[in-house]
C-alpha cells in the first residue's frame, strides 16, 4: 500500500486551495498511470482500466463506488464492455485537490486485486 493511498481525505470546500504546480508534479509521480486532463476551466485525473468482460468491469465500478462512499468523495465512472474510465476531481472547487490523488491511489489498489483485469 502506498503512503498516498493510506493518507486521509479531508473535508473539501469550494474555497479550499487547489494543488499547486509543485504539489501536482510531486503527486502525479505517485500515480504514474493516471493522466491529467484539462476540461473547460479545470483539471481532472483520469485512468482507463481494462477487463475481460462487462461483469468484471461492473464489479470494479461498484468497488470504486464503495470506496468513494466511505469518504464522501465521488468520481465520474464510465463503465463499458471490458473497460472502466475513472475520473477524479473536486467538483466543489472545480479542480484538483490532494483528495483526488489519494482516491486515485486507492483506485489503483483496488485495480491491483480486481478480478478479470487485462
Swiss-Prot record:
Gene3D superfamilies documented for this protein: Transcriptional coactivator/pterin dehydratase
SUPFAM superfamilies: PCD-like (SSF55248)
Cysteine disulfide links: none
Gene Ontology MF annotations: 4-alpha-hydroxytetrahydrobiopterin dehydratase activity
TM spans (from-to): none
BP GO terms, sorted: tetrahydrobiopterin biosynthetic process
Keywords, comma-separated and alphabetical: Lyase
EC assignment: 4.2.1.96
Catalyzed chemical reaction(s): (4aS,6R)-4a-hydroxy-L-erythro-5,6,7,8-tetrahydrobiopterin = (6R)-L-erythro-6,7-dihydrobiopterin + H2O
Family: Belongs to the pterin-4-alpha-carbinolamine dehydratase family.
PANTHER family: PTERIN-4-ALPHA-CARBINOLAMINE DEHYDRATASE-RELATED
Name listed for the protein in its UniProt record: Putative pterin-4-alpha-carbinolamine dehydratase
